[in-house]
Structure formats: structure tokens, C-alpha cells
Design a protein with these regions (language model features):
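Bacterial extracytoplasmic/cell-wall-associated proteins, especially those involved in peptidoglycan
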Residues: 1-174
Length: 174
């Protein structure tokens, strides 16, 4: 952003950069190979953008999303409900938020939310296009890590144990 730039100029540059990135990454063809539209792929990338604590987590979060979609499980991504609340600087979800029938409440709805919830960066788009290999269905902040990374598992009991450790550490794990 340069001094004197208007909002319109900044937005035009952002759109041009995104268009260039999407063309370079062949999002049309590669999304289709994943069984998604480009818009759905950008929605997945936006979820990754909001959820991943580290760059290393991005492809793993992508894999969890795709695995849960394949299993017809709700995504249970709290960031989608936080998007609706529009609370800058963090979000604390209430029981009412989690019970909401909002189309963005992926706790109780299957499939992707109706729109992206953030503007994904290139790393999140690449992760959506290149998910890690794995059978994971769950992830939670890793209470033993200090870098914002997550613990990934396919086992609900392991997940519940990791979530309990996360809560004990005061990390606000759902």
C-alpha cells in the first residue's frame, strides 16, 4: 500500500494479485480434480487460513476437512461461527452460538459454509490444492507446543484426551 492509495486502488491490487495466483496455480483444473468448484476450493482455503496455527498445519487441516466431507461429518470448525459474530480480536462462542441454525454453523451442519470466511493467502490455497496424506478426522491446539500448532488424530478418544490437556492449559479449546 502506498501513501495516497484509495480503498478502491488497494482492493483492485488485491483482486489482481489473487487472480494472478489462481491462474498460476491452475485452480480451475486442480479444483475439478478434487471434485470441487474453484469457489468451493477457495472456501476450503479460507477455513485453512483461519484454523491453521502454523504453515506445517495447513495441509493437515486441509486433509481433515476433506476427510470429514468424505465421511459426511459436520466440519465442526468454530471459526465459521466466529465469522458470523464478526468480533475483531478473537471470539468466544456461547452455547447459543453453537446451537444456532446459521448456515455458517459447521458444528451442526454438514458440508462447507456458503461462502469463504476469510481471504486466503497463497499458502492456504496451496494446502487446499495439496492436502497432506492422512486419515485424521480431528485436531485441537497442541497443549505441549508453544507455536500454535495442532494435534491431529483419527481416534476420538485421543482427540478427547488432547482436548482435555488443551483445556487444562487454558488454551480455550472447544
Amino acid at each position: 500500500v502506498e501513501e495516497g492509495d484509495t480503498e478502491a486502488i488497494v482492493i483492485q491490487r488485491m483482486v489482481a494479485q489473487l487472480d494472478s495466483t489462481l491462474t498460476e496455480l491452475d485452480i480451475e483444473g486442480r479444483a475439478q480434480a478434487l471434485g470441487l468448484t474453484p469457489y468451493q476450493l477457495l472456501t476450503v482455503a479460507s477455513l485453512i487460513e483461519e484454523e491453521a496455527g502454523t504453515d506445517e498445519d495447513r495441509p493437515r487441516v486441509a486433509r481433515v476437512i476433506y476427510n470429514r466431507l468424505a465421511e459426511e461429518m459436520p466440519l465442526q470448525i468454530d471459526a465459521t461461527s466466529c465469522y458470523v459474530k464478526n468480533e475483531p480480536g478473537g471470539c468466544r462462542l456461547t452455547e447459543a452460538d453453537l446451537a444456532s441454525d446459521s448456515p455458517y454453523n459447521t458444528r451442526n451442519r454438514q458440508g462447507l459454509p456458503p461462502t469463504p470466511i476469510a481471504s486466503p493467502g497463497r499458502a492456504s490455497i496451496e494446502a487446499a490444492l495439496n492436502p497432506a496424506d492422512g486419515d485424521w478426522l480431528f485436531y485441537v491446539l497442541d497443549a505441549e507446543a508453544d507455536d500454535g500448532s495442532h494435534f491431529f488424530t483419527a481416534d476420538i478418544d485421543e482427540f478427547n484426551q488432547a482436548r482435555a490437556r488443551c483445556r487444562e492449559a487454558g488454551l480455550g479449546c472447544g
